[in-house]
Amino acid sequence: MLLTVLAVVGCFTAVNGHGYLTIPASRTRLGFETGIDTCPECSILEPVTAWPDLEAAQVGRSGPCGYNARVSVDYNQPSEYWGNEPVVTYTSGEVVEVQWCVDANGDHGGMFTYGICQNQTLVDKFLTPGYLPTNEEKQAAEDCFLDGELKCKDVSGQTCGYNPDCTEGAACWRNDWFTCNAFQANTARACQGVDGASLNSCKTTIAGGYTVTKRIKIPDYSSDHTLLRFRWNSFQTAQVYLHCADIAIAGSGGGTTSKSTTSTTSTTSTSRSTSTSAPTTTSSASTATPICTTQASLIPVTFQEFVTTMWGENVFVTGSISQLGSWSTDKAVALSATGYTASNPLWTTTIDLPAGTTFEYKFIKKETDGSIIWESDPNRSYTVPTGCSGTTATAAASWR
C-alpha cells in the first residue's frame, strides 16, 4: 500500500507546467488574476486514461471546470471572483476566436476540444453560489459538454487535421477535436507549434507560456448565463486539463431558449479582473426571451487585444473592409488603453460592422517614430454575427 501511495504522489509531482483557458477568461484565469490561484496551469486530472481514447477518463473531483490541488480551489462552484456573471456575451451562430495558454515546461502534445452543455438545469448546479456539485453531477455535466462538442469542422475554412502521434484506426484518429502538432517535432512542436507564437505570449507561472488559438462556432441556443468548457487531453502523460468560462449566448435563431434561475443577484468584487467584457444582464433571474421583430443591419463588435506595450506605443486594428481601413495603416482604427494594467494589458475598441460580413484583419503597433509593427501571419478572420436589434459581439485575441 505504501509503495502504491508513493507512486501516485510521484505522478503528481514529476512533471511541471501545463495549460489553461485564457480567452474567454476562464474561472481559472480570474482566480489567477485575483491572486487566489498561484499556478493556473496546474489544474490537472491525473492519473487517468487520456490517450488514445479521448473520452474514457471520468472527471471525478476535477469536474468540467477543474480542481487545482496545489491551492485547493474547486472551480466547479462560484466564488466572490468568478461564476456570478458572464465574462462575455456571444451570439448564436457566431464564429469566435478562443485561446488557451500552454506552459513551456509542460507541453505534452495531444488534442483539445470545447463544448457547451444545453441542459440548463444541469449547468445551473455550477452557477449556484454556495453549492458544490457532487462527483456524479460533475460527470453528468462533462458528458453533456462532450455531447455539445463545438467541432473544429463546424467553422468553414478552418484546418482540421489528424494528430500525428495517433495511429489511423485508433480512438484518437478523429478531426472533430482540435489537434496539436507532433510531440517530438524538430520545429513547431506539440501544442506551442499551433500558433508558433513567441515564449511569454501568454502568462504562466513556471516557464512562460505559448498561446494556442482556434475558432469555434456558437450553437443555435440562448442563455443568460451558461458555461464554455475547454478540455485538453495530453499525449505524453496520463493527464487531462479542464476549464470553464462563464458566458452568455444571445439571439437564438430557433434553438432551445433556456435561462438560468439559480440566483437573482450577483456579487461583484472591486478587485475583479477588468480584462473581460461586461455582461449584458446584471441578474440571472428567469425572463421571457423576446421575439426578434427587427434584424440588426449593423452589429457593434468589440475588438479586444491583449498586448504589452511601451510608453508611447499605440495599438490599432486594420483589415480587408473599409470600416477597418482596407489594410491602410493610415486609416487603421485606434484601440483604447483605458483598461490597461501591467498584469492585464488590454486594448479595446468597438466598431459598428455590417451583420453577416466576413473579413480578415490584424492588429498593429505604431511607434513614437511613426514606424509600424505588424502582428505575425496568418491574418485573423472574423464573421460578424446576425441577430436582433441590440445584438453585440466580441473578437478577443492576444498579440502574436
Curated annotation (Swiss-Prot):
Disulfide-linked positions: 39-42, 65-244, 101-202, 117-144, 152-160, 166-172, 180-191
Post-translational modification: O-mannosylated.
List of residues that carry Methylhistidine: 18
GO terms of biological process kind: polysaccharide catabolic process
Classification via PANTHER family: BINDING PROTEIN, PUTATIVE (AFU_ORTHOLOGUE AFUA_1G14430)-RELATED, CHITIN-BINDING TYPE-4 DOMAIN-CONTAINING PROTEIN-RELATED
Any GO MF annotation of the entry: metal ion binding
One Pfam family from the record: LPMO_10
Domain notes: The CBM20 domain is involved in binding to starch.
UniProt main location, coarse: secreted
Glycosylation sites: 119, 379
Protein name per Swiss-Prot or TrEMBL: AA13 family lytic polysaccharide monooxygenase A
Documented EC number(s): 1.14.99.55
PROSITE patterns xrefs: CBM20
InterPro entries: Carb-bd-like_fold, CBM20, CBM20_glucoamylase, Cellulose/chitin-bd_N, Ig-like_fold, Starch-active_LPMO
Residues making up the signal peptide according to the UniProt record: 1-17
A GO-annotated cellular component: extracellular region
Low complexity composition bias: residue spans: 257-287
Natural source organism: Aspergillus terreus (strain NIH 2624 / FGSC A1156)
Binding site for Cu(2+): 18, 108, 241
Cofactor(s), by name: Cu(2+)
Biotechnology: Starch-active PMOs provide an expanded perspective on studies of starch metabolism and may have potential in the food and starch-based biofuel industries.
Known function: Starch-active lytic polysaccharide monooxygenase that oxidizes the C1 position of starch substrates. Catalysis by LPMOs requires the reduction of the active-site copper from Cu(II) to Cu(I) by a reducing agent and H(2)O(2) or O(2) as a cosubstrate.
Keyword Secreted on entry: yes
Catalytic activity: starch + reduced acceptor + O2 = D-glucono-1,5-lactone-terminated malto-oligosaccharides + short-chain malto-oligosaccharides + acceptor + H2O
